[in-house]
């Protein structure tokens, strides 16, 4: 394969559905989605087997590192209200118990399997705070854990038995028992097992505070040495008890028609509320009690503080923030609860240099520009940082290299953060451009999500180096140290993404020749992976295609206002907004579907006094939807459920019990009209089930029938009704069928049947002429849709389902289809059209020779008119436009139409027509259907000449691009060809090909690695680079097989090697290399030659790649050595002869640091 043009044409004939690029969080999202579905089914039927299977899958994926099991458990709490109350037959506790006590999945490292989940907590905390806790043990808790699991299992079993879903005898082949109604005796058994489980948990819970104490100690309390471990375990036990209470209440109320002890249930509800309050207070006070003192100007203090807060937040506070939603009284059991958490957690400071944390730290707030100094706020206190309401898209780090006075300086000195609506550039200053030894540049663009950032550094008399790495070791700038003095240890945080990176400088230096203020370190702030700045309601259930029943809570921190202050509230999962008297908070909310909502607010007041609030909603058309004041009594004056926060008692109150919000942008205004400060936690939107009945039209007048008959006939070009009229659109056909359906069955039954048959024929003809496949997004369509795009049913402006492109918050939002060249005719004009019910920031692109159509459509929200028998459509009640807008004559028309001309056919590259619709801004969305691309007419001579000029221009650019790609690929192609015999990529590699030849091959990054329109999908050049990578993978496999040394390239760490002294893997230029730290460090391996034939001589070649000092290799009964003493990576080869079947390989440092990239021992059988 010697010519890149052999490869090149293949990428033009790509599928219409380019592969979607994976996100770092996709495995978690998919696992949680499957669990959610399994829980929904289990909650409705009580049938356990499918749920157990998905729990097993979740556990397995956590064991291989694909997902974080603790994060999955934490996220599962949100499922507690998922099953509608009328359908639920089992409570959520029956699922949650198996999360906490994964007895199905084997045993932990302790003898008691019930401790397995808590061992996971210990391991995760160790990772988060980089401590060992070597003396900590769970031994004193084992009996308590066993008792809790036993009692909860009894409760589980009694619930299952009550609904006829208990264990069944054998020989019942393929039978799934049907859930039944419990008897009174069964419900009494469930109540008693609930009491037993509650008592067992509450007896054990105090001992979670300090498991190191004897079980006879009746007053255990948290200890500063172990609180990082014990508070998360206490939180887990408390969560079990709260969910047990919630589940029992839910179960008892579900079957209240059988037996219902109202006084006991009411008392249990009170107990649940009190426990939420008590447990929350315990978590809050404990967190504050042991929180380290922060000195923002000292790196060691900053790191100690950050480790404590992030561990407590991720393992305890985040969970405690969900506890109020377990209150059956205030949170409905028939909605999915989704609460945004805007709290920030911070990484350790990485850099400016590593090896000593007791240095000054100048934290630079890159979000706060100023006109002095380096241009941003310096000496910042991270405790004052808040969620900035922006979403990080990508980042770049700047690095510079300077050789000054025999000292090599190479490090990062700036960064660029790219957000959806702005770019922040910081640093990159004080560069001496006149110094020819000064080199500087930005590193590669790193796209979000980004999970971690680290710095590795080396400081000596002649070297001042650091390298910056992200996402587990990907180098992004700087120089890799030859011998590391230290490296930061920031790990990826479970289900968290980086949103801001703050720069850090230090006036201290590790060595007198090192730079200070120019060298930057970094500290990252992390937020939940699914948090976005936008507030979106009106989600669609993809199964029912109807609005989902959701409770969405948006922190007030996501709003804005003049001079608003933010105050810390760790228990809320967000900072609270402090509104002084008559201050106003504003928040934008995007509603995707018109429906009714209950709107609530969670707040506290100064001194827990009464609250006075003015609540105002401005709808999409600028009209007031509600504009009124509310007075709420103080917490003490009524029996209100509250949780104590740092600034008062947080309570819920209803702002409006039921209000219909139209689809589109809503502006929410909340004003404090009291003299006392108001602390806003969040605003909640609860979607309400629809109670309205669709109005139907019923035509009984002969005049109506005559009008509709005429409209049906006008769909066709002739009385034969075999061809559509040229001007008839697909949407017009749908409008006519709505009128036909409105004819009375009783009066016009025969005529209606005949007319419907004709309209069906018209629809089929419309589909046949449409070169798009699935213009109505019906089954079998060939659209490439973004992952959140969904079909919606029952919209009055559409016949059948339509496509909703949601706001592109977490993921892009688009619909795309490519028309194959074989479907097109030469020298022909095509019409592109469709109907939009509503859109904001909808981008429409039609491309053949280069984006012939590129438009932005904003179609206002308008309601449907009643179906009429005349020719007017049912769009729309006048709002911003009149009904005439539907005919395409108005600038904001619901119906769009464009033309695109096709010249000569380009079948060799399958040029085709590309048609895409996407949402351009995060708060946009669109409702679309009836999309068409149909043949219009042949081109005129003048039009043919015009399109020929376009073709020539396109062809020239195409050929130039092909030549540039071929030039870019040729060096890599030559390298890969050299690896293989006869340049056959499917054949055998040359005997001389080794790891070094492989590592020298760099697959180039081509310009179209990503799709030009569909963000997040592969582009056409990926096909080329994949073929290169596959050839390299095949070569690697063959080289690996011929190497007698096991794991000679260190791809599997130190597996198969015997290690002595300080030998460890490190990253050098993004590759793993072995570092022998001192002369007492070595690795060795013994190899036995298979099928060795006596004294037959075998020639072996040994290839090493290393840096600095010396190497010695030992062969059994005979010593052979290879010596290395260079300051750069060097490869050496040597041939040895021996007659035995056993070889000992020994790699030894003879001085200081010795770096090894790979070791090879290859048989060469002499003829």
From Swiss-Prot:
It comes from the Bacteria. Signal peptide: none annotated. Changing residue 477 to A: In strain: PS178D4. The keyword Transport does not apply. The keyword DNA-binding does not apply. GO terms for biological process: sporulation resulting in formation of a cellular spore; symbiont-mediated killing of host cell. Gene3D superfamilies: 2.100.10.40, Galactose-binding domain-like, Pesticidal crystal protein, N-terminal domain. Keywords: Sporulation, Toxin, Virulence. One of its GO terms (molecular function) is toxin activity. Belongs to the delta endotoxin family. Endotoxin with nematicidal activity. Toxic segment of the protein is located in the N-terminus. This is Pesticidal crystal protein Cry21Aa. It comes from Bacillus thuringiensis.
């Amino acid at each position: 394969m010697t010519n890149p043009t052999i490869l090149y044409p293949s990428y033009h004939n790509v599928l219409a559905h380019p592969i979607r690029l994976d996100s770092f969080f996709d495995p978690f999202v998919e696992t949680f989605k499957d669990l959610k579905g399994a829980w929904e089914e289990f909650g409705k039927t009580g049938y356990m087997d499918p749920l157990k299977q998905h729990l097993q899958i979740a556990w397995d994926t956590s064991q291989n590192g694909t997902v974080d099991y603790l994060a999955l458990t934490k996220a599962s709490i949100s499922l507690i209200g998922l099953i509608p109350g009328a359908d639920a037959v089992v409570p959520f506790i029956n699922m949650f118990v198996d999360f906490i006590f994964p007895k199905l999945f084997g045993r932990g490292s302790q003898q008691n399997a019930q401790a397995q989940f808590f061992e996971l907590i210990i391991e995760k905390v160790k990772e988060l705070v980089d401590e060992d806790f070597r003396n900590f043990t769970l031994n004193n808790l084992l009996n308590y854990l066993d008792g809790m699991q036993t009692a909860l299992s009894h409760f589980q079993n009694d619930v299952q038995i009550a609904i006829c879903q208990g264990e069944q005898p054998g020989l019942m082949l393929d039978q799934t028992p049907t859930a039944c109604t419990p008897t009174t005796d069964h419900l009494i058994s469930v109540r008693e097992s609930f009491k037993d489980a509650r008592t067992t948990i509450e007896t054990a819970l105090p001992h979670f505070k300090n498991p190191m104490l004897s079980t006879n100690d009746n007053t255990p309390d948290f200890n500063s040495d172990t609180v990082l471990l014990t508070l998360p375990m206490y939180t887990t036990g408390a969560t079990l008890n709260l969910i047990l209470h919630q589940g029992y209440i839910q179960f008892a109320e579900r079957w209240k028609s059988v037996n219902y002890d109202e006084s006991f249930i009411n008392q249990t509800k009170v107990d649940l509320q009190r426990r939420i309050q008590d447990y929350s207070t315990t978590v809050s006070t404990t967190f504050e009690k042991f929180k380290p003192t922060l000195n923002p100007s000292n790196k060691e203090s900053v790191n100690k503080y950050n480790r404590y807060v992030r561990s407590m937040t991720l393992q305890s506070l985040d969970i405690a923030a969900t506890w109020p939603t377990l209150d059956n009284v205030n949170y409905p059991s028939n909605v999915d609860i989704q609460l945004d958490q805007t709290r920030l957690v911070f990484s350790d400071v990485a850099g400016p240099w590593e090896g000593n944390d007791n240095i000054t730290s100048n934290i630079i707030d890159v979000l706060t520009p100023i006109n002095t100094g380096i241009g941003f706020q310096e000496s910042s206190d991270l405790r004052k940082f808040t969620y900035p309401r922006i979403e990080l898209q990508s980042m770049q780090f700047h690095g510079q290299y300077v050789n000054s006075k025999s000292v090599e300086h190479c490090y990062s000195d700036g960064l660029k953060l790219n957000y959806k609506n702005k770019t922040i550039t910081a640093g990159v200053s004080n560069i001496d451009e006149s110094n020819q030894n000064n080199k500087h540049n930005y590193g590669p663009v790193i796209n979000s999500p980004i999970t971690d950032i680290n710095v590795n550094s080396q400081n000596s008399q002649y070297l001042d180096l650091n390298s910056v790495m992200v996402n587990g070791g990907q180098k992004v700038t700087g120089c890799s140290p030859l011998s590391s003095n230290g490296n930061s240890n920031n790990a990826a945080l479970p289900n968290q993404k980086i949103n801001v990176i703050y720069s850090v400088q230090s006036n201290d230096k590790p060595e007198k020749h090192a730079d200070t203020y120019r060298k930057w370190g970094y500290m990252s702030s992390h937020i939940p992976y699914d948090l976005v700045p936008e507030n979106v309601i009106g989600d669609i259930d993809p199964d029912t295609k109807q609005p989902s029943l959701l409770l969405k809570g948006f922190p007030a921190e996501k709003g804005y206002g003049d001079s608003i202050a933010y105050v810390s509230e760790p228990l809320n999962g967000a900072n609270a907004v402090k509104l002084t008297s008559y201050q106003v908070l504003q928040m934008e909310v995007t509603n995707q579907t018109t429906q009714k909502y209950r709107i609530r607010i969670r707040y506290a007041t100064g001194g827990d006094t009464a609250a006075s609030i003015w609540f105002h909603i401005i709808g999409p058309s600028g009209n007031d939807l509600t504009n009124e004041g509310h007075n709420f009594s103080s917490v003490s004056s009524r029996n209100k459920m509250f949780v104590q926060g740092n600034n008062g008692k947080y309570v819920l109150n209803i702002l409006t019990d039921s209000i219909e919000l139209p689809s589109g942008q809503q502006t929410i205004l909340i004003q404090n009209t009291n003299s006392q400060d108001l602390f806003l936690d969040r605003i909640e939107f609860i979607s309400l089930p629809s109670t309205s009945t669709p109005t139907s039209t019923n035509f009984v007048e002969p005049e109506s029938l005559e009008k509709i008959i005429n409209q049906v006939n006008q769909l066709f070009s002739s009385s034969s009704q075999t061809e559509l009229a040229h001007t008839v659109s697909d949407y017009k056909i749908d409008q006519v069928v709505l009128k036909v359906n409105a004819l009375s069955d009783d009066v016009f039954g025969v005529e209606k049947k005949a007319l419907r048959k004709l309209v069906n024929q018209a629809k089929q003809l419309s589909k046949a002429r449409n070169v798009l496949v699935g213009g109505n997004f019906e089954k079998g369509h060939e659209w490439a849709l973004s992952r959140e795009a969904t079909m919606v049913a029952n919209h009055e402006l559409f016949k059948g389902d339509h496509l909703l492109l949601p706001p592109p918050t977490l993921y892009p939002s688009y619909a795309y289809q490519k028309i194959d060249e074989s479907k097109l005719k030469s020298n022909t004009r095509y019409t592109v059209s469709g109907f939009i019910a509503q859109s904001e920031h909808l981008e429409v692109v039609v491309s053949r020779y280069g984006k012939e159509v590129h438009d932005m459509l904003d179609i206002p929200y308008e309601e449907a008119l009643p179906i009429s028998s005349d020719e007017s459509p049912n769009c729309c009640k006048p709002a911003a436009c009149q009904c005439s807008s539907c005919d395409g004559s108005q600038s904001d028309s619901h119906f769009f139409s464009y033309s695109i001309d096709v010249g000569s056919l380009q079948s060799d590259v399958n040029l085709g027509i590309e048609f895409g619709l996407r949402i351009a801004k995060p708060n946009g969305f669109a409702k679309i259907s009836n999309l068409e691309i149909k043949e219009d007419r042949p081109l005129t001579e003048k039009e043919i000449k015009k399109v020929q000029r376009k073709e020539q221009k396109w062809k020239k650019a195409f050929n130039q691009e092909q030549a540039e790609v071929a030039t870019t690929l040729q060096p890599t192609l030559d390298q890969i060809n050299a690896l293989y015999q006869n340049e056959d990529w499917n054949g055998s590699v040359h005997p001389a090909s080794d790891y070094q030849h492989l590592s020298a091959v760099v697959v180039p990054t081509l310009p179209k690695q990503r799709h030009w329109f569909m963000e997040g999908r592969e582009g056409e050049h990926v096909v080329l680079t994949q073929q290169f990578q596959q050839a390299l993978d095949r070569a690697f496999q063959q080289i690996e097989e011929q190497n007698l040394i096991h794991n000679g390239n260190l791809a599997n760490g130190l597996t198969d090697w015997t290690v002595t002294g300080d030998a460890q893997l490190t990253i050098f230029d993004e590759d793993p290399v072995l570092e022998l730290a001192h002369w007492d460090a070595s690795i060795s391996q013994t190899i036995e030659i298979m099928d060795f034939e006596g004294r037959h001589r075998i020639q072996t070649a040994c290839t090493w790649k290393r840096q600095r000092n010396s190497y010695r290799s030992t062969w059994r009964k005979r010593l052979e050595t290879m010596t290395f003493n260079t300051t750069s990576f060097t490869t050496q080869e040597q041939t040895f002869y021996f007659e035995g079947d056993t070889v000992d390989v020994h790699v030894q440092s003879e001085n200081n640091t010795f770096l090894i990239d790979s070791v090879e021992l290859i048989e060469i059988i002499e003829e």
